[in-house]
Amino acid sequence: IKYKYTLLANSYLKVNKINHNIETKELDLINLNGTNANCDFILKNISIGNDTIDVIINHNIRETTSNIKCDGLSVNKGTLNLNVTTIIPNGCVRAKANQDNEIISMNELNNTIKPLLLIEEYDVEASHSAKIGSFNEDDLFYLKSRGIEEKEAKRLLINSFLKRNLDDCEIKKYIDELEVKYEQRRF
């Protein structure tokens, strides 16, 4: 699957995306082609197969902004390979680029995050982060100490992880529907 977004001057794009297919191979290509083009891209990926997601953000002109937030949940036999690349060529002054990537693994399989900042300009603000792990044992212990069984505690943590950074009620509703669908499965 390939998605291409092109933003011109003074435009704004907000993408809230949820994937939960068995095998996902996806490319999201974002071209910021006009001054003051701004993009907020939020991806939630539930991996139950071998998933590969590539996100490429091209800051093709000065004074552009991208905020990329990719969250993955690896369950059952699922793996996630997440590649996020931001490109800021020379001359694209005052560009702002942020990447925040996290995968929560509910299995023992390998997941990868490759955050790349390819920057040829000095006058920019850019940051990236990548985290792969499981839920914090202290959080799980706290919920269990309050009488919540482990399965329910994990369900609450998964729900919170998938809904964070989302402000669209329809997407939150969709996650609730997914939760019902997967309720019979063991995470």
For the regions a language model picked out, list residue spans one by one.
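Conserved beta-strand/loop scaffold segments within soluble protein domains that form the structured core
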Residues: 1-148, 161-164, 170-187
